Amino acid sequence: MTLSSIPTPTATPPDILRCAYMDIVVTDLAKSREFYVDILGLVVTEESDTAIYLRSFEEFIHHNLVLRQGPIAAVAAMAFRVRSPEDVDLAEAYYQELGCRTERRTEGFVKGVGDSVRVEDPLGFPYEFFYATTHVERLAWRYDLQGPGALVRLDHFNQVTPDVGRGRGYLEDLGFRVTEDIKDEDGVTYAAWMRRKDTVHDTALTGGTGPRMHHIAFATHEKHNIIYICDKLGALRKSDLIERGPGRHGVSNAFYLYLRDPDGHRVEIYTQDYYTGDPDNPVVTWNVHDNQRRDWWGNPVVPSWYTDASLVLDLDGNPQPVIARTESSEMAVTVGADGFSYTRKDDELAGFKLGSTL
């Protein structure tokens, strides 16, 4: 299936500050609370029998994550904060010119957030744009509450889409800037990292069957905080929640850990990427066959990390249909009979890394 190109609107795009929160549907609120609050230590801003509003320790807006009880695990919204109330108007007009479905609620879609617009964007993702929000206590100095694995900030989203190049152009029109990408010698793009704040990304595009949500990522201060989370999961006999890592990414240079929540939603714990705020910040391009692009130490990527992702919902709360990627898949070209990776590009031996062997 050939996807149509996305036109560049004449309307001014909203001035997006950062990724702000994700609204996800879970099938067992109690189990999700145990994972996000009891194990990961996110702060409960407020909760009811049907929803829990969570934030990280340095956050001052109402929440970074909403857990809502529902029949199917999925993502209801990926929300971005904009610079002013007028930027909500700009977002609505921008997507209306694109021909996207929009819904505006002056009272907000969730507690703690005011005037907002949600859209079904050209890639099929449920985006939200808002400015007005309830301020809450920033707990950065409350070391009596923070554990050694404290999650201090929401860092980024990651989205799965069939055509990364198409999505990249759309997000660049929206004002995002590319910091890193993965390509092959033929120019096929497998992934791209896009930012608004001065880090490596606020969201990333991963090539695959989509629209689906690959992961939400929270930052810790240092890598030892991630090691503690691993130790805690081991002590609780919940090491099966660890999908991948800990390790260091090549892309972003960040230390990472990937977990799966009780519904399979993927959560990354992430720390120590780099500053990208200068206007001439260079794009870093990785070869898809570079064995150190996804893990700087060359450790293999588990297949589920490539294949599994969360469904996303339309504005009526129904799962969006997904479209398969037709370009080469990153897993296929790097692993297995038809794939190869290298540790040193000029080596004669090329294969794929399994354990300690190439």
Language-model features: where?
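Conserved active-site tyrosine of GNAT-family acetyltransferases
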Residues: 32-37, 95, 124, 167-171, ...
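N-terminal entry module detector
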Residues: 47-116
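Core segments of cupin and vicinal oxygen chelate
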Residues: 14-17, 23-61, 109-110, 159-200, ...
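Conserved short beta-strand elements that form part of the metal-binding/catalytic scaffold
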Residues: 42-76, 119, 125-134, 180-214, ...
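Vicinal oxygen chelate
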Residues: 2-12, 18-27, 70-162, 189-194, 238-358, ...
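Short N-terminal helix-initiation segments at or just after the protein's N-terminus
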Residues: 14-27, 62-66, 92-93, 99-107, ...
